[in-house]
From Swiss-Prot:
Residues carrying sugar: N395
Keywords, sorted A to Z: Glycoprotein
GO biological-process terms attached to the record: Rho protein signal transduction
PROSITE patterns: DH_2, PH_DOMAIN
Name of the molecule in the record: Pleckstrin homology domain-containing family G member 7
Stored SMART domains: PH (SM00233), RhoGEF (SM00325)
UniProt xrefs under InterPro entries: DBL_dom_sf (IPR035899), DH_dom (IPR000219), PH-like_dom_sf (IPR011993), PH_domain (IPR001849), PKHG5/7 (IPR040181)
Residue numbers spanned by region Disordered: 1-48, 109-140
Keyword Glycoprotein appears in the UniProt entry: yes
Domain DH: residue ranges: 313-488
Gene Ontology MF: a single term: guanyl-nucleotide exchange factor activity
Residue ranges annotated for the PH domain, each copy included: 535-668
CDD domains xrefs: PH_PLEKHG7 (cd13245)
Length: 691
C-alpha cells in the first residue's frame, strides 16, 4: 500500500506540548470500517481524573517530529499526539492534554500492516449492515459532508445525528478546517448520550462538542448530591411566614369595654355607694359583709376580663381565624385551651348575677335593704362553676406540656408573639394566663370564708359554710383526680416503652422449641404494670457493672417490686412520634427515649420488695475496678438463697444514698402492708351462740 506524507503548515503551540496540526487526506473506500467506534483508538479522550493528572505531568516536554506509516493515505508527523484543540464545555482544562508519545509510538508503529489487513477483512461484514442501522448511525455521502464543512466555515455549527466521515476534498478546504479536525476517526453522536467520568470517546474535533448539545457536560444532566434536595425550602418557609404575618395583621380584636361591669373592677365599695348617692349602713358587721361580697365580685370581674376573656378573644379566636385561612391546622384547640369556652360562659354568668344583685341594692330606695347573695352562691358553687374548673384543671398539665412542644415551631412562635403584644394582655404571657383557673379555684374557699366571718345571721352562716365545704371537697377531689390521672397516664406510657423479652431471649439456659413457644406467649407480663393498685415511688438512671463492660440501666421502684431495665435508643428516629402526646410527668431521660423511638428492655424478672436486699459497698472493695458510689442489690428466693445480684453505680454519693433510702423505705412499707393483710385474713368473726 502506498505511503504518503502529509504536509502541515507551522502553527505556534497554544498549549503545553501541542504539536502542529495535520491536514486531511482522502480516505480510501475500503477503509470505511475504520470509521466505527473503537475504544482502543489512539485518539480516544478520557475524562478520568487519574489519566488527566498523568497527562499533565508528561506535557512539559516536547518530542521531536517522527514519521509514522499510516493507514491508507492518512499521515501525520512523528510524535503527533491526538487531542482536542478546544476544551470540552464545562470540562476541566486538562481534559485535552497530550497522550504519552511513547505509548503512541508503540501502538502506531507496531504492526500497521496487520491492522490494515484486519480492517479489510472486516469490511464485508460491516458494509451490508449499514442499511439496518438506525438513522443516527447510518453513514452519509460526501456531498452532505462537503456542505456541512462549508457551513462550518461560516461559523454555523449545526448538530447532526449522523456519523462524521473525513471529506475526500479536505485538501481544498480552508486551513481552519484542518485545525478543527484530528486524525482520530469519528465521534458517536447518539441521542441521550452523556459524558461521564471514565468514558472513552473518539473525536474528530472540538467543534463536534460545540455543535452537539447532547454531549455537553451540563449540570442538569447530573444527579444532585442529595436526592431529596432542600433547595428552595428556605424561600417557601420565608413566604409562609410572611403570609402568616399578613394574615395576623388582618385580625380585629373587639374591645372589652362593652361589658357593664367593666368600670367597676378597680373601684371600692365606698366609691360605688358614693357614686350612686347611697348612704352606707350604720351596722359595721353588715358593711364588712358587703365589702366581702364586693371583693368576690371585683375579683371575679378581674378574673373574667383580664384572664379568661383574653385567652378566648385574643388567643383562641385568633388561632381559629388562622386555621380558617389554612394556618396552624395541626394545632389542637382542645389540648391547648380545654373547655375554656364553657369556663368563660360560666364565669360571665356568675359575674352578671353578682352585678345584678349589687345593682338592685344600690338602686333601691330603702336604706335597710340587704344583698341577696346566698341564692347566687348556691346556684353557681353547687352547680357548674366547680365542675367546669375541674375539667379545665385536669387538662392543665397536658396543655402546658403541649404548649412547650409547640414553642419550637417558628409559625406558632410568631402567633404567640403577636398575641402577647396586644395591649389587653397587660404584658401577661400564655403560661400565666393558662394557670389562672387553677389559682381561681383555690381562692374561692378563702373568699367564701371571709364572707362567712362577716355574716351575723346563723342560717346564713350555715349556708355559706356548707358552700365553702363543697368547694374544698371539690378541690380535694380534683387533687385525687389529678394524681390518679397522672399515675394512669404515666403507667400507660410505661407499658408502651417497657419491653418484656420472652424467657428464651432473657436467659439462654432455657431451651424452648418453636412448637412450644405459643404456650409461653399466653402468659407474657405486659399487663403487670396495672395502675389500679400499683404506684411508682422512684425512678432513675444508674450504671450496672458487668464482667466485661458497664451498662446503662434504668430502675423503676414500685410499691411492691423493683424493675431493672436497660435503655435502648433507636438510631432511626420515628417521624410519627408526637412530643405533645407524651406524659408531662415523665422524667427527661424517659422523654428523650420516647422521642428517639427507644425502649426499656427488662434485664431480669421483677424483684419483689420482700425478696430484695440492698447493701452499700465500701470504696475500698471496688476501687480496683474503678467503681465509685456503688451499692449491691440481691434478689433472694423464698428459701433466702440469692438467685440474682446487681452491682450498681450512681453518679454521686448523694444519689446513691437517695436510692438506698428509697428502697429501704419501700421495703418497710411493703412489709407492714403484707403483715396487715395477714392479720385481717386470720381474724375471724365471733361464733354465733346458736351454733
Amino acid at each position: 500500500m502506498e505511503k504518503t506524507e502529509s504536509f502541515c503548515p507551522e502553527v505556534p503551540p497554544q498549549d503545553c506540548g501541542a504539536s502542529p496540526r495535520p491536514s486531511l487526506r482522502s480516505l480510501p473506500k475500503n477503509q470505511g470500517s475504520l470509521l466505527q467506534f473503537d475504544r482502543q483508538a489512539p485518539g480516544r479522550i478520557s475524562t478520568s481524573p487519574t489519566l488527566r493528572r498523568l497527562r499533565t505531568r508528561g506535557c512539559g516536554t516536547r518530542q521531536d517530529a517522527w514519521q509514522v506509516t499510516t493507514w491508507g493515505s492518512w499521515g501525520a508527523p512523528v510524535g503527533f499526539p491526538c487531542y482536542l484543540s478546544k476544551s470540552l464545555p464545562g470540562s476541566p482544562k486538562d481534559s485535552s492534554h497530550l497522550l504519552s508519545p511513547l505509548r503512541l509510538h508503540s501502538r502506531l508503529t507496531s504492526e500497521p500492516e496487520r491492522a490494515l489487513n484486519a480492517a479489510d477483512s472486516l469490511e464485508p461484514q460491516t458494509r451490508p449492515t449499514d442499511k439496518y442501522l438506525p438513522p443516527e448511525l447510518q453513514p452519509v455521502n460526501e456531498g452532505s459532508l462537503h456542505q456541512a464543512s462549508l457551513r462550518q466555515q461560516e461559523g454555523h455549527f449545526l448538530p447532526s445525528p449522523t456519523l462524521r466521515h473525513p471529506s475526500p476534498q479536505g485538501e481544498e478546504l480552508h486551513p481552519s478546517r484542518f485545525y478543527e479536525h484530528r486524525r482520530s476517526s469519528v465521534v458517536l453522536n447518539l441521542p441521550g448520550l452523556e459524558v461521564f467520568p471514565g468514558d472513552l470517546l473518539v473525536s474528530d474535533g472540538a467543534a463536534d462538542y460545540l455543535c452537539h448539545p447532547l454531549l455537553l457536560l451540563n449540570s442538569e444532566s447530573k444527579k444532585p448530591r442529595w436526592p431529596f434536595s432542600k433547595r428552595g425550602v428556605g424561600k417557601d418557609k420565608h413566604k409562609h411566614i410572611s403570609d402568616l404575618e399578613n394574615c395576623l395583621s388582618s385580625v380585629k380584636i373587639t374591645s372589652f369595654r362593652g361589658y357593664d361591669f367593666y368600670g367597676l373592677k378597680d373601684k371600692t365599695w365606698d366609691e360605688v355607694l358614693e357614686t350612686h348617692h347611697k348612704l352606707p349602713t350604720d351596722q359595721l358587721d353588715l358593711k364588712k359583709q358587703q365589702e366581702a361580697v364586693w371583693e368576690l365580685f371585683t375579683s371575679e370581674c378581674t378574673y373574667f376580663l383580664d384572664h379568661l376573656l383574653v385567652l378566648k378573644m385574643i388567643f383562641m379566636n385568633t388561632l381559629r381565624y388562622l386555621q380558617t385561612h389554612e394556618y396552624l391546622l395541626d394545632v389542637d384547640l382542645w389540648r391547648l385551651f380545654a373547655n375554656l369556652e364553657e369556663l368563660t360562659q360560666t364565669s360571665l354568668g356568675f359575674v352578671n348575677s353578682l352585678f345584678g344583685i349589687i345593682k338592685d341594692y344600690v338602686d333601691a330606695s330603702e336604706i335597710s335593704s340587704s344583698l341577696d347573695f346566698i341564692s347566687v352562691l348556691t346556684k353557681y358553687f353547687r352547680g357548674s362553676l366547680c365542675q367546669s374548673h375541674q375539667t379545665y384543671c385536669l387538662n392543665y398539665s397536658a396543655a402546658i406540656f403541649y404548649l412547650e412542644s409547640l414553642r419550637q415551631r417558628d409559625d406558632f412562635g410568631i402567633y404567640l408573639k403577636w398575641c402577647e403584644q396586644n395591649e389587653q394582655c397587660r404584658r401577661l404571657h400564655v403560661p400565666e394566663l393558662l394557670v389562672a383557673p387553677l389559682q381561681r379555684l383555690t381562692r374561692y374557699p378563702l373568699l367564701l370564708k371571709n364572707i362567712w366571718k362577716r355574716s351575723m345571721d346563723s342560717a346564713e352562716k350555715i349556708m355559706i359554710y356548707s358552700i365553702k365545704e363543697k368547694v374544698e371537697k371539690s378541690i380535694r377531689d380534683l387533687e385525687g383526680k389529678v394524681k390518679w390521672l397522672d399515675n394512669f397516664q404515666k403507667f400507660r406510657y410505661l407499658q408502651e416503652i417497657i419491653v418484656w423479652p420472652p424467657l428464651w431471649d432473657r436467659d439462654k439456659r432455657f431451651f424452648i422449641p418453636e412448637c412450644l413457644k405459643h404456650i409461653f406467649k399466653e402468659h407474657m407480663a405486659e399487663n403487670i404494670l396495672s395502675p389500679t393498685s400499683r404506684h411508682l415511688l422512684y425512678e432513675g438512671k444508674l450504671t450496672l457493672a458487668e464482667s466485661t463492660r458497664f451498662l446503662d440501666v434504668y430502675l423503676f421502684l414500685f410499691n411492691d417490686f423493683l424493675l431493672v431495665t436497660k435503655t435502648k435508643c433507636n438510631k432511626k428516629k420515628l417521624g410519627g412520634s408526637d412530643p405533645g402526646l407524651m406524659c408531662p410527668s415523665l422524667t427527661p431521660e424517659l422523654q428523650a427515649v420516647i422521642k428517639e423511638g427507644g425502649s426499656c428492655t427488662v434485664l431480669d424478672q421483677p424483684i419483689p420488695l420482700d425478696r430484695l436486699v440492698v447493701k452499700s459497698i465500701e470504696p475500698l472493695h471496688v476501687s480496683v475496678f474503678g467503681l465509685r458510689n456503688a451499692f449491691l442489690i440481691q434478689h433472694e428466693n423464698r428459701y433466702r438463697q440469692c438467685i440474682a445480684a446487681f452491682l450498681l453505680q450512681a453518679q454521686t454519693e448523694n444519689i446513691k444514698k437517695t436510692w438506698m433510702a428509697q428502697i429501704t423505705t419501700a421495703i418497710s412499707c411493703f412489709t407492714k402492708s403484707q403483715e396487715t393483710k395477714k392479720i385481717s385474713l386470720f381474724t375471724l368473726p365471733a361464733e354465733s351462740s346458736e351454733i
